[in-house]
From Swiss-Prot:
Family affiliation: Belongs to the Fmt family.
UniProt entry tagged with the keyword Membrane: no
GO MF term set: methionyl-tRNA formyltransferase activity
Entry-linked Pfam families: Formyl_trans_C, Formyl_trans_N
Binding site for (6S)-5,6,7,8-tetrahydrofolate: 115-118
GO cellular component: cytosol
Name of the encoding gene: fmt
Record protein name field: Methionyl-tRNA formyltransferase
InterPro entries found in the cross-reference section: Fmt, Formyl_trans_C, Formyl_transf_N, Formyl_transf_N_sf, Formyl_transferase-like_C_sf, Met-tRNA-FMT_C, Met-tRNA-FMT_N
Catalytic reactions of this protein: L-methionyl-tRNA(fMet) + (6R)-10-formyltetrahydrofolate = N-formyl-L-methionyl-tRNA(fMet) + (6S)-5,6,7,8-tetrahydrofolate + H(+)
Its job: Attaches a formyl group to the free amino group of methionyl-tRNA(fMet). The formyl group appears to play a dual role in the initiator identity of N-formylmethionyl-tRNA by promoting its recognition by IF2 and preventing the misappropriation of this tRNA by the elongation apparatus.
Entry EC number(s): 2.1.2.9
Species the sequence originates in: Blochmanniella floridana
Keyword S-adenosyl-L-methionine: no
C-alpha cells in the first residue's frame, strides 16, 4: 500500500550557493511548503555561479525572506512561532541558532553538513577536507542541539574526493548528494523511522573559518601542501602571492611529480622561479616543484599562463622570487 505523506511547513535557514541548491530542490522536488527563508546573504550579492542565489529563489517563488542580521534572536523566535512551523532546515547558515528556536518546531531542527561528522565540525568542512588531503568526505544530516555540529546523525552519505576537486566542484557534488538525502530524511522523520545515531567522539576534527590571510602562499610549505590549499581556497579566498609589487591570484596549479622526494633544489630559496613554460610557471617550494597554470593579475581576468606570458613575461623571469 502506497503511503500518502502530508507536506510540512518549513522554515529554511541558509546563506551560500550550497544552501541555495538544497532550497531549490525542496521547493521543486517535494510536497513541502517553504513558508519563510532566513539568510545572512546580502541583497547586493551578485550572481557568480550557475546556482540561483537565496534572494532570487525567494523572489521567483514568492516566499517570505528575512535578512537575519537585521533581526534579534527574540524577533526570529516570534516570527517562527507565528508561522506555525513543523520543522526548521539549516544549511550553511553561518550563525548559531538559539536554544529557544531549536525547541519551537514540532519536529525540531535539522542541519545538512558538508562532511562525515564528527570529522570537520565547523564552518569550513569542504575547504579543510581538501586542504588536508582527505580522499573521502560526504554529507551528514543531524538533529540540531545547542552545540556546533554535535547533534545525533540522522543520515550520512559518503563522497569520494577527486585529486582535481576544488571547493567549488566538491561543493556542487555534495549539494547534489545532500539535497537527495534531505528529501529522504524528511520522509523518514514524518514516518517516524529515522534513527538517531550519536556521533563518535573519538574522531573529532574542527574546520575553522577561512580568512584571507591564510590564502597568502607560504612557499616554505611543500608543493603538495600548496597545491591542496590552492584547490581548497578556490573560489574563495583564492591563493595569492606577490612579485614586483603586483598581487597575483592562483586559480590552478599542478605538482611536478618528478621533483618530489629530491633535494636537488635545496640551495634555492623557496618561491624561486625555476623556469617558465607554456604549460606553467615552475616554482621551487620547501619540498618539490609546483607548476602554476592559471593566474589572475590584480584587476584582470584569470587566464592560463600560456596566454598570460604574452603580456607579462617580464614579471616572471627565471630566478625571480615570489613572496
Amino acid at each position: 500500500m502506497k503511503l500518502h505523506l502530508k507536506g510540512l511547513r518549513i522554515a529554511f535557514f541558509g546563506t551560500s550557493d550550497f544552501a541555495a541548491y538544497h532550497l531549490f530542490v525542496l521547493i521543486h522536488c517535494s510536497i513541502h511548503k517553504i513558508v519563510a527563508i532566513f539568510t545572512q546573504e546580502s541583497i547586493k550579492i551578485k550572481q557568480k555561479s550557475s546556482i540561483l542565489s537565496i534572494h532570487t529563489i525567494s523572489q521567483i517563488n514568492n516566499i517570505l525572506l528575512f535578512q537575519s542580521y537585521f533581526l534579534s534572536q527574540s524577533q526570529i523566535n516570534h516570527i517562527i512561532k507565528n508561522l506555525n512551523i513543523d520543522i526548521i532546515i539549516v544549511v550553511s547558515y553561518g550563525v548559531i541558532l538559539s536554544q529557544e528556536i531549536l525547541h519551537i518546531p514540532k519536529l525540531g531542527c535539522i542541519n545538512i553538513h558538508g562532511s562525515l561528522l564528527p570529522r570537520w565540525r565547523g564552518p569550513a568542512p569542504i575547504q579543510r577536507a581538501l586542504e588536508h588531503g582527505d580522499t573521502m568526505t560526504g554529507i551528514s544530516i543531524i538533529q540540531m542541539n545547542s552545540n556546533i555540529d554535535t547533534g545525533d546523525i540522522l543520515h550520512s552519505t559518503p563522497c569520494k574526493i577527486s585529486p582535481k576537486d576544488t571547493s567549488y566542484t566538491l561543493s556542487k557534488k555534495l549539494a547534489c548528494i545532500g539535497s537527495i538525502a534531505l528529501l529522504k530524511t524528511i520522509e523518514k522523520i514524518i514516518l517516524g523511522t529515522c534513527k538517531n545515531i550519536p556521533q563518535d567522539t573519538s574522531n573529532i576534527t574542527y574546520a575553522y573559518k577561512l580568512n584571507k590571510k591564510e590564502a597568502h602562499i607560504n612557499w616554505n610549505k611543500s608543493a603538495i601542501e600548496i597545491e591542496r590549499r590552492i584547490r581548497a581556497f578556490n573560489p574563495w579566498p583564492v591563493s595569492y602571492f606577490k612579485i614586483k609589487n603586483q598581487y597575483i591570484r592562483v586559480w590552478n596549479a599542478e605538482i611536478n611529480k618528478n621533483s618530489i622526494n629530491t633535494d636537488q633544489y635545496n640551495d634555492f630559496q623557496p618561491g624561486t622561479i625555476l623556469k617558465t613554460h607554456p604549460n606553467g610557471i615552475y616554482v621551487i617550494t620547501g619540498s618539490g616543484i609546483i607548476i602554476l597554470t592559471v593566474l589572475q593579475i590584480s584587476g584582470k581576468k584569470k587566464i592560463h599562463v600560456k596566454d598570460l606570458m604574452n603580456a607579462y613575461s617580464s614579471l616572471f623571469t627565471m630566478h625571480s622570487v615570489l613572496t
